[in-house]
C-alpha cells in the first residue's frame, strides 16, 4: 500500500492545514507545465495522496490499513495471502472485486491546477518596480451557479441507483462460480450524487474557461527571467474546487538608452573635441530625470563618469541602488575649414614640436587605448 504521508512529506498526525500546505508545495514543484512532462507520474502520485488525506472519511479508512483508492491493496484479500499477481489477473476479468478498482464516491470538487504565463516589462519598471498586466486564459469559477454545477445554485442529490456509494455491485457467473463485482455507477459516473438540472453555463462542471487580465506587482530590482507567484490565481478546479497558483515569468525588454549589469546601468554619451580638451558640464536624461555629468578636461574616448546611486534598486535592500556609468566617446571632426585646420595645426605643432618619429616604447600596447591627440592626428593625416 502506498505511503501517502511519505508522498506528501508529512507526519501521520499532520493537521489538515499542514497537509494542504505540503500538497500545494509539491503540486507546484512537480506540475508538468512547470517541471516538465517527465514529472507527470509524480504529479499524479501527489494528487492521489492529497485526495485521500484531505478527505476525513478516506483518511480514516487509510489509517485503518485500507487504501480508499485501492481497497484490496491492504492486508486482506489475495495480496495479503501472497497472491498479489493473481489479484491483477482477476481484476482484469471481473473488475474491482478482486483488487482492481477504486471503491467509494469520487469527489466532485477537485483542486485546481497551477497556471503559467509571462509578462514583458520595460527597464524602468525593473529599476523602480511597478505593476504589469497579464492576460491569461484559464478555468474560472462559474458565476452562474457559484461552482455547484447545478442550475440556480441547487446542491447535488444522492444518486438513487448507487445510494451515494459511487459504485454498483452485481453477481456474475464465472469459471469459478458466481462472483460479486463492482464498477463505477453509470448514472452518477462514480460521484455518488447527481445534478438534476445542470447549470447551462458550465454544463455541471462548476467552472468555465475565461480570458481575464491579472495585475502583477513587480518588485524593484527584479531580474530578467525571474518567476513571480500569485497564490490562488491559477485554474479553478472541477466542481468549483480551490484555484491553483499562477506563476508569471518576467521578461525585461531591451532599452534604447541604457543597458544593465547587475545593479549598475550603463549609457554612452558623445562629446565634442573642445569639451574633451577643456572640460564641460552637460545634462543627460536618466530614469531619475535630467542629471548633470561633468566631463573633466583631457577626457579620452572610453573614459567613464560615474553617477552614484542612479542605477538599479537592490532587490534585497530597497534603500540601496547601483550606479549609472556614462561611457564617453570623443567626436573628432572629419571636415575642417581653413581657419579651423590652421588652428589645429598650430596646436599640434606646439605639442608635437614637429616630431615625425614615435619611439617604440611610446606606442600603444595591445589592448591599450590611444590618447586623444593620437586619434586627432590620425583623423587629420
Curated annotation (Swiss-Prot):
Details of cofactor binding: Binds 2 Zn(2+) ions per monomer.
- Give the record's keywords alphabetically: Chaperone, Cytoplasm, DNA replication, Metal-binding, Repeat, Stress response, Zinc, Zinc-finger
The answer to whether UniProt assigns keyword Cytoplasm to this entry is yes
Q: Tell me the SMART domains matching this sequence.
A: DnaJ
Which prosthetic group or cofactor does it need? Zn(2+)
Judging by the UniProt lineage, the source's domain of life is: Bacteria
Question: Biased composition, Polar residues: where in the chain?
Answer: 356-365
For region Disordered, the annotated ranges are 355-381
| ZnF endpoints (CR-type) | 129-211
One function term, GO molecular function aspect: zinc ion binding
User: InterPro entries per the record?
Assistant: DnaJ (IPR012724), DnaJ_C (IPR002939), DnaJ_domain (IPR001623), DnaJ_domain_CS (IPR018253), HSP40/DnaJ_pept-bd (IPR008971), HSP_DnaJ_Cys-rich_dom (IPR001305), HSP_DnaJ_Cys-rich_dom_sf (IPR036410), J_dom_sf (IPR036869)
Q: Where in the sequence is the signal peptide annotated?
A: none
Sequence ranges of the CXXCXGXG motif repeats: 142-149, 159-166, 185-192, 199-206
**Residues annotated to bind Zn(2+) 2:** 159, 162, 185, 188
As for what it does, the entry says: Participates actively in the response to hyperosmotic and heat shock by preventing the aggregation of stress-denatured proteins and by disaggregating proteins, also in an autonomous, DnaK-independent fashion. Unfolded proteins bind initially to DnaJ; upon interaction with the DnaJ-bound protein, DnaK hydrolyzes its bound ATP, resulting in the formation of a stable complex. GrpE releases ADP from DnaK; ATP binding to DnaK triggers the release of the substrate protein, thus completing the reaction cycle.
What is recorded about the domains? The J domain is necessary and sufficient to stimulate DnaK ATPase activity. Zinc center 1 plays an important role in the autonomous, DnaK-independent chaperone activity of DnaJ. Zinc center 2 is essential for interaction with DnaK and for DnaJ activity.
Assembly, in brief, is: Homodimer.
- This chain belongs to the protein called Chaperone protein DnaJ
The protein's organism comes out as Bifidobacterium longum (strain NCC 2705)
Amino acid at each position: 500500500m502506498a505511503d501517502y504521508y511519505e508522498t506528501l512529506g508529512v507526519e501521520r498526525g499532520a493537521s489538515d492545514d499542514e497537509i494542504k500546505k505540503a500538497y500545494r508545495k509539491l503540486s507546484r514543484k512537480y506540475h508538468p507545465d512547470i517541471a516538465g512532462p517527465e514529472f507527470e507520474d509524480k504529479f499524479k502520485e501527489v494528487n492521489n495522496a492529497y485526495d485521500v488525506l484531505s478527505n476525513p472519511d478516506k483518511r480514516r479508512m487509510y489509517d485503518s490499513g485500507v487504501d480508499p483508492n485501492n481497497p484490496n491493496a491492504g492486508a486482506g484479500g489475495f495480496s495479503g495471502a501472497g497472491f498479489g499477481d493473481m489479484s491483477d489477473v482477476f481484476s482484469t476479468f471481473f473488475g474491482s472485486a478482486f483488487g482492481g478498482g477504486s471503491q467509494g464516491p469520487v469527489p466532485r470538487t477537485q483542486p485546481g491546477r497551477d497556471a503559467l504565463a509571462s509578462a514583458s516589462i520595460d527597464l524602468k519598471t525593473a529599476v523602480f518596480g511597478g505593476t504589469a498586466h497579464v492576460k491569461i486564459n484559464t478555468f474560472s469559477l462559474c458565476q452562474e451557479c457559484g461552482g455547484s454545477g447545478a442550475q440556480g445554485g441547487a446542491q447535488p442529490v444522492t444518486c438513487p441507483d448507487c445510494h451515494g456509494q459511487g459504485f454498483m455491485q452485481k453477481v456474475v457467473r464465472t469459471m469459478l462460480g458466481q462472483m460479486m463485482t463492482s464498477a463505477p455507477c453509470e448514472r452518477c459516473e462514480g460521484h455518488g450524487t447527481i445534478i438534476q438540472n445542470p447549470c447551462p453555463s458550465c454544463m455541471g462542471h462548476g467552472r468555465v474557461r475565461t480570458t481575464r487580465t491579472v495585475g502583477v506587482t513587480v518588485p524593484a530590482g527584479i531580474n530578467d527571467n525571474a518567476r513571480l507567484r500569485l497564490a490562488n490565481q491559477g485554474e479553478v478546479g472541477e466542481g468549483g474546487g480551490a484555484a491553483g497558483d499562477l506563476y508569471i515569468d518576467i521578461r525585461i525588454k531591451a532599452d534604447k538608452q541604457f543597458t544593465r549589469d547587475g545593479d549598475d546601468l550603463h549609457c554612452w554619451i558623445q562629446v565634442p573635441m573642445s569639451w574633451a580638451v577643456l572640460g564641460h558640464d552637460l545634462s543627460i536624461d536618466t530614469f531619475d530625470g535630467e542629471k548633470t555629468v561633468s566631463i573633466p578636461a583631457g577626457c579620452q574616448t572610453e573614459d567613464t563618469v560615474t553617477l552614484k546611486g542612479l542605477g538599479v534598486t537592490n532587490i534585497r535592500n530597497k534603500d540601496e541602488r547601483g550606479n549609472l556609468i556614462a561611457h564617453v566617446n570623443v567626436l573628432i571632426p572629419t571636415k575642417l575649414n581653413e581657419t579651423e585646420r590652421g588652428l589645429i595645426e598650430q596646436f599640434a605643432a606646439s605639442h608635437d614640436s614637429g616630431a615625425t618619429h614615435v619611439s617604440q616604447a611610446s606606442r600603444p600596447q595591445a589592448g591599450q587605448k590611444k590618447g586623444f591627440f593620437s586619434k586627432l592626428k590620425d583623423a587629420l593625416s
